[in-house]
């Protein structure tokens, strides 16, 4: 297995809901420790820059968020089932009957099942009703709250994520796993760093935390950085299986998505046009999107007068327990970022 495939598998499988991204941070630090200076902060934002800084050179920020949508233990019921709340944007019907990992007080991952009232005990009205988080519990197989606390070592405030180990389908060049929003972007940041260690720019890279609950990690990290431009990788939701053809803007295997607008930011139009033109020049497929919803770390960086673009890698079924993404889209996203960094210069950036 080559290093790229292993990197994607490892980042996808890593435990890292918003607020508990430690495992992802450790993966990143280990990955680039030979080429970068690395450190983190108390929020577990991970900072990476090349050991040989170039004085008076352009500084480019590469970012992806380390967290995934997950859950947190809210309360333990007397019968041993667990009430929980979502971390990030979930549709509750997508998680019923799924397995989760609960990181207990000893740092062990305990398996549990997202349970709802069995159909045998539901009235006709409830069978057709809306599923809400208040209707769901996590069941670890315990029969009392005491057992949950003393035998499973599970407490209020423990973090959870879907129990999914990423798989690679070599024949079709696709990945099936969890947390591609934005672990596929985390892997891309690592790949770009490995390809650009000799580039004539200063590269700052971050894996920021708590994006799924309000871009809190980037709001902290950006105050420690002073880039001239920023590229934010995202695992963007693919729309090709439910939109009309003319509205499809992030299809699987059609290239990375460059986003003009979402509810958190308007892109730097001159930087965006530069990236699109360069992609066409290099025969790098890209898709362009305008979104009425959504929000990313770019919504933070551009407020600090930093021209920013989003390079999105399409993910089918983002914010669910399982997603699908394409190796081809990943490769083209990495290639585009590398080409931008290799070709851009200070004069061009001043024009943004």
Regions found by a protein language model. Name each.
Residues 1-352:
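N-terminal hydrophobic/helix-forming segments and targeting peptides
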């Amino acid at each position: 297995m080559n290093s790229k495939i292993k990197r994607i598998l490892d980042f996808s499988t890593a435990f890292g809901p918003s607020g508990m991204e430690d495992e992802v941070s450790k993966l990143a630090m280990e990955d680039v420790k030979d080429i970068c200076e690395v450190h983190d902060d108390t929020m577990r934002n991970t900072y990476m820059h090349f050991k040989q800084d170039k004085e008076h050179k352009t500084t480019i920020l590469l970012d992806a968020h380390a967290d995934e949508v997950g859950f947190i233990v809210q309360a333990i019921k007397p019968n041993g089932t667990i009430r929980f709340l979502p971390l990030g944007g979930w549709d509750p019907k997508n998680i019923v009957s799924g397995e989760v990992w609960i990181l207990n007080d000893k740092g062990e991952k305990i398996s549990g099942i997202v349970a709802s009232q069995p159909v045998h005990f539901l009235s006709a009205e409830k069978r057709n009703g809306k599923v809400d988080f208040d209707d769901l519990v996590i069941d670890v197989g315990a029969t009392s709250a005491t057992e949950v606390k003393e035998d499973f070592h599970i407490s209020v405030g423990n973090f959870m994520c879907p129990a999914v180990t990423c798989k690679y389908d070599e024949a079709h060049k696709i990945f099936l796993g969890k947390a591609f929003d934005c672990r596929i972007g985390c892997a891309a940041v690592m790949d770009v760093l490995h390809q650009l260690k000799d580039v004539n720019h200063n590269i700052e890279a971050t894996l920021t935390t708590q994006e799924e609950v309000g871009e809190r990690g980037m709001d902290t990290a950006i105050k420690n950085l002073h880039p001239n431009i920023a590229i934010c990788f995202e695992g963007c939701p693919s729309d090709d299986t439910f939109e009309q053809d003319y509205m499809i803007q992030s299809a699987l295997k059609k290239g990375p998505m460059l986003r003009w607008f979402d509810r958190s930011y308007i892109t730097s139009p001159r930087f965006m046009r530069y990236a699109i033109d360069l992609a066409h020049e290099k025969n790098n497929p890209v898709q362009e999107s305008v979104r009425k919803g959504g929000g990313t770390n770019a919504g933070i960086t551009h407020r600090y007068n930093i021209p920013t673009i989003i390079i999105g890698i399409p993910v089918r079924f983002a914010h669910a327990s399982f997603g699908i993404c394409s190796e081809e889209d990943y490769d083209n996203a990495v290639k585009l970022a590398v080409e931008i960094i290799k070709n851009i210069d200070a004069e061009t950036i001043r024009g943004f």
